[in-house]
Amino acid sequence: MDFSNTIRSKLLPALAAFALFFVVSAAYFAPQFRGEALPQHDVIQYEGMAKDISDMRAATGEDPQWTGGMFGGMPAYLINVAYPAQLVKRTVGQVVKIIDTPAGFLFFAMVSMWLMLLIVGINPWVGIVAALAYGLSTYFLLIIGAGHVTKMWALVYAPLMMSGAWMTLRGNVWCGAALTGLAASLEIGANHPQITYYFLVAMAAFWISEGILSFREGRLRDFSLRTAALVAAGILAVGSNFSPLWYTARHSKETIRGGSELAATAETSKNGLALDYATAWSYGKAETLNLLVPDFMGRESGTTFPADGQTAAVLNDYGLRGATQQLSAYWGTQPYTGGPTYLGAAAVFLAALGIALARGRNKWWIIAACVVMILLAWGRNLMGFTEFAFKYLPGYNKFRTVSMTLVVVQWAVPLLGALALMRLWKGEIPRERLLRALAWAAGITGGACLLLAVAGGSLFDFGRAESADYMTDTFRHIFESNNMRSYIHRGMDIESAEATADAMAADRAAMMRADAWRSLVMILLAAGGVALFALRRINRYVLTGLLAGVMLLDLVPVDLRFLSSENFVSPRRNQVTASAADKAIMQDKDPGYRVLNLTVSPFNDATTSYFHRSVGGYHGAKLARYQDLIDRYLSNADDGVLDMLNTRYLIVPGKEGQPEAQRRTTAFGAAWFVDSVIYAPSAQAEIDLLGKTDLRTTAVVSGQNPAKSASRPMPLGIYASARIELTEYRPNYLKYEYTLPEEAVAVFSEIFYDQGWKAYVDGEESPYFRADYVLRAMTLPAGTHTVEWRFRAPGWTAVEGVTLAASLAILLGAVAALVYCFRKRTEKEK
């Protein structure tokens, strides 16, 4: 091949793509390059979760694998554990570190999508258009703003994983298998199983489609071999992440994802997450239109009504100036939303064009995957289908926030658009057919926008009924608080509420109409470009350039509604800082006590763990028994349970609203001896007894969990001279000194977890058992002795060995495949 042609056809578009993606990412996150920081909720929470882990690692070089900083203590498998044998993640995975986040998120999302499109046969110039649509889809900016780091990386790697499957089943099987193994290893290593799961469902749709076609074409033998290669790549990808997967799988059985031993609670069921809890964030059926029209349902929960709108005018008339800032313009069914999953009107139009023009083999599995994912996203709004999926789709009941399935649609829409544009690029579509398809795609998408813009106000109620009920209660409260009950008797509360609800509905309708017109304009711009190409007024290079511009014009302004330079702050403001209450508590150098912070939502906030061992925390997979304790006792700040958790301090709102420390004098301490043991026949009886028992003198032990105690007859008789003290503390190591005149049971204010914790008395391993539903207990011999607790992930050496072997196989396979494919390409070009 001529060198100049190589530059023009391969190198130039690659340089253009990378340069454009970098410029777009850097421009969007320009404050990052000025040294400013983006305060991200989940990142801030993560810093609290992992604080004692990071501190110990920095101080000693040892990885504790356990945190004592939140929920009384829990394994760190789903927080921060170092797995040295994950070589793929620690080598190839470091490429993404060359550009810092958040700009790196956008850049590599677009690069990954662009590379996938090249692999499936899309021209690189066409790929730029689809990559922009994928990387700039609004959901990415929402999760970047929230700090969902693992989710974002999983979405970066997902297109590459899908392209590996495509190549394995359709192209060079060995190169495809190598790519699948490498990309799937990175995808799994991103540590967001939910995203990986949804893309595996999409991959299954592709595999089924290829299987059907192979059967029809008599290629089942070839298909079977390709399937075997794909499965082998998947096994190696899993193996290269075996360590985190193994420990996560073992640990998940003990968490709310594995179910509760009690009757189903709000968050757990017997076999997984409770259906109501898992489907709390379900996309409304009508809400799906915000994939096309961003403000269809009032934007986000935090969006208020405009100061010059009808709602403000009505409330001003009632003397409630400024009250609009307390009302949300969002009228969907989700409890809270940070914004819509807007895909771009132009991108949706191109996807519709893809449905009309793409070859059946390429499109039907994509369409099927999109339909299934949208139905799953509806969750409780399509409960029959959701219940079916929960019962029969393996592993599906382990995940919450079902609306997240739309990430597959977010990937599929640009892909469908690229498949359509590729047929135009190759000149495969006759002009008449192209114009008919263009009219159909523009008619469907543009027609929907036009209908919403012109008649949308009469098609929906814009949450008017719910608003009327809410405002009725609000006005009734106002009238009662101001001794104006006569207004209520005259029905003024209802009349005022109805007028306000009408105004709220009108403002929401205006927001929808404005964005419907906007989306229509974007569709017309994209359709106009395709029409000019069909009429041969512009060439294919101009068309792709025009469509790339439309993608930027369409998506960036909407993205900026939710995440802009205004969200950035100085690095210092982005740090977690200790309050006066925190500083006062930190003067207490005793290592054993815990803190309950009531100035935040204590069981949905990990910032307290940045400074203290916290009773609360923030995690989506906390231990199931601890969740039971929260539901039954801690949510009501039960004194007895707080005492057994050695809660020495509360942080409460002070007189001037500032956090204030309160010392509790009844906490039991880091460990204590009990006079007697009560045996409970079931987990339900165990937790019930906590509220009926003096836990300072009596331990509650499950009858199904042998106490391994030689002193079953109770009471044991504790003398005044008995003492036990925590003398050394690290997350994975605790040391106690005790003196005891006769054998007795000691309860330790540490969370029971027998998959890694071992107890030693004077250096010899000793048995222990669970007491008080979540704590540890031991029968200790008389005398003066030392008790040590050590945590180590069980089977660490063997598990890491499997991870290392699979990682090496993937890396060597990738190198071999690269050499093989390069030689094949060279021979072909000769």
Question: Model-found features: residue ranges?
Answer:
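Contiguous transmembrane helix-bundle modules in multi-pass membrane proteins
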Residues: 131, 147-158, 168-185, 193-234, ...
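Transmembrane signal-anchor helices characteristic of membrane glycosylation enzymes that use polyprenol
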Residues: 13-49, 234-247, 372-375, 448-457, ...
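Extracytoplasmic
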Residues: 260-267, 549, 555-719, 725, ...
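Transmembrane-helix signature of polytopic, membrane-embedded enzymes
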Residues: 117-136, 171-177
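Membrane-interface coil-to-helix junctions
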Residues: 24-113, 132-155, 269-343, 376-392
